[in-house]
Amino acid sequence: MNKVKKRILLVLLAILAVILVALLVFFGVYFTRIQTIGSMEQLTDYADGYNLYRMDVKYDYSLDDIIDYGIKDDQTMIDAILKESLPLLPVKIKAPSFGCTAFTLTDTDGGVHMGRNYDFRKDTSAMLVYCAPKDGYKSIAFAALDNVSANVPDENIKKKLASLTAPFICLDGMNEKGVSIAVLTLDSEPVHQNTGKPVISTTLAIRLVLDRAATTEEAVELLRSYDMFASSGRDYHFYITDASGDGRVIEYDINGEPRELIDTPSEAVTNFFIRHKDKVLPNQKNDIYGHGRERYDAVLKVFEDEKGNYTSDTVWNAMKSAAQDPDPDAITSNTQWSISYNNTDLSADIVIRRHWNDVTHCDLESKVTTPSK
């Protein structure tokens, strides 16, 4: 009988040891993720429930591990992101979509700004994401929380965990070198390059540039070293600017095969191929070449009207001129956020959902966010 009890005790101790090891492993993996969740803060309080939040990413992540996972489609992209941000947990997210306007302006004091409207017909809260990767540049960036079903991210543990994916689903941002990037949707067939290079998806390209590019030129060369997979069944292009004012549109040639990356200097961009702007008319869709010419023209008109006296107000006037009200039939309607990135002093001013008199200011170096109006 004593031998039986001894064996039972040994089995129980073995089970307890396994459980303890598992708990230690889980706690080791999730300690900094728990810290990240703890840093979450609500910055606005609107009656409609769609707000601006901030989060300081404390956990180490490996962008290379995500890319090395092998992205072939939306599902493998999502699986790769979840494996890195939420290991050991069964969480589901959906692939995001994006619309928008973006532009570069150098003010009369020499400050370089990127103005950015994020337009999408489905309402969303926004997460301001601070990242400081150990092998990359510090950055601020913005994620649409509706894409992870977490418009109120601190509501429950499921939404808090889903928000940990935010570094890899950002739609625009700026790093400590003064490089800003934004993604904008197009109307063409999604690019899916297959030339033998490692594959990145749309939002991973944004994280790649923010973490590793010190200039627009470096960003372009980085993107050239990867094959692009456009996620969510849509095509996209990128707008990149830097502290010198080098603003370029990054597009994958719609008339080429394989669709070669082409960078085109431009003051502004919306939802049409900038290199084919002669084929694009305002207030209509222009087949594969895109739409949104009227917003592009509106931004340039503000630039022309205020030429010689550019200030931060010019940035806001341009964004207001291109902002859009909700339209359930237009995917790139309904401006969700507007941001003036200052590539020179490394700060950003943010307005959520066209609340133009309610501006939140954030500073990249100090990670301080304050209401400025």
Indicate where each model-derived feature is located:
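A recognition module on extended beta-rich or small alphabeta surfaces enriched in W/G with H and D/E
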Residues: 139-144, 167, 272-293
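Long, charge-rich alpha-helical interaction segments
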Residues: 288-314
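Extended amphipathic alpha-helical segments with heptad-repeat/coiled-coil character used for oligomerization
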Residues: 233-279
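A short secondary-structure junction signal
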Residues: 126, 192-195, 248-253, 261-262, ...
